[in-house]
Amino acid sequence: MAHKKGVGSSRNGRESHSKRLGVKLFGGQAAIAGNIIVRQRGTQHHPGENVGIGKDHTLFALTDGVVTFRKGRQDRSFVSVLPVAEAKA
């Protein structure tokens, strides 16, 4: 029997860095073309009018306007960017 504990590697230290996911621009906020609206894993939110989707499912504004969220079929969330003139009407 060993009288001293064998020196092994630590069992801690493998927590991953946070990925900073989530909604970056909320409903009613102004968006400039190219602004990131949502960072997500998979399509929790789907692209609507004037919104593009990146290969990592990031939603971004294609035009300047106001961000809106709406529910579609089967409770699917859509994100759109409405031009300012349209949003006021």
Swiss-Prot record:
Q: Which Pfam families does the UniProt record give?
A: Ribosomal_L27
The UniProt keywords, alphabetically, are: Ribonucleoprotein, Ribosomal protein
- PROSITE patterns membership: RIBOSOMAL_L27
Question: Which molecular function term from Gene Ontology is one that the record holds?
Answer: structural constituent of ribosome
Gene Ontology annotations of biological process type = translation
What cellular-component terms does GO give this entry?
Answer: cytosolic large ribosomal subunit
Q: Tell me if Ion transport is a UniProt keyword of this record.
A: no
Q: What domain of life? A: Bacteria
**Family named by the database record:** Belongs to the bacterial ribosomal protein bL27 family.
Indicate what this protein is called per its UniProt record: Large ribosomal subunit protein bL27
Organism of origin: Cytophaga hutchinsonii (strain ATCC 33406 / DSM 1761 / CIP 103989 / NBRC 15051 / NCIMB 9469 / D465)
The gene is rpmA
